[in-house]
């Protein structure tokens, strides 16, 4: 199954989700994108520190969301606003969900950009908990 995680810049939330998912869902094809990503930009220092702290696979550098990405089996956005933007750009898509919506949770993933390391760690924990639920949804 091909899963793409989407946030704004593809430097904080979606790369964390990509790394966590690569660890928890090793048989799936995992990627991340940003709706406003600068192609090739490095992920945030704090996100990279968390990836190393938890010994996760490193994500790819920032990549923008493109129409070809709609071919993924599942596209999981960090917020309703990201989902709405994809719909406004490409029309309604049956494979696009917010991450929390997909696993039956209510918490959106706020952007930690500019926050302290603790804020990034809280974001990591939220994303980990939600991505972990994907495992059970696919069993």
UniProtKB/Swiss-Prot annotation:
InterPro entries: LMW_PTPase, Ptyr_pPase, Ptyr_pPase_sf, Tyr_phospatase_low_mol_wt. Its EC number is 3.1.3.48. Belongs to the low molecular weight phosphotyrosine protein phosphatase family. Pfam families: LMWPc. It comes from Staphylococcus epidermidis (strain ATCC 35984 / DSM 28319 / BCRC 17069 / CCUG 31568 / BM 3577 / RP62A). It catalyses: O-phospho-L-tyrosyl-[protein] + H2O = L-tyrosyl-[protein] + phosphate. This is Low molecular weight protein-tyrosine-phosphatase PtpB. GO terms for molecular function: protein tyrosine phosphatase activity. Keywords: Hydrolase, Protein phosphatase. The active site is at residues 7, 13, 111. It comes from the Bacteria. Dephosphorylates the phosphotyrosine-containing proteins.
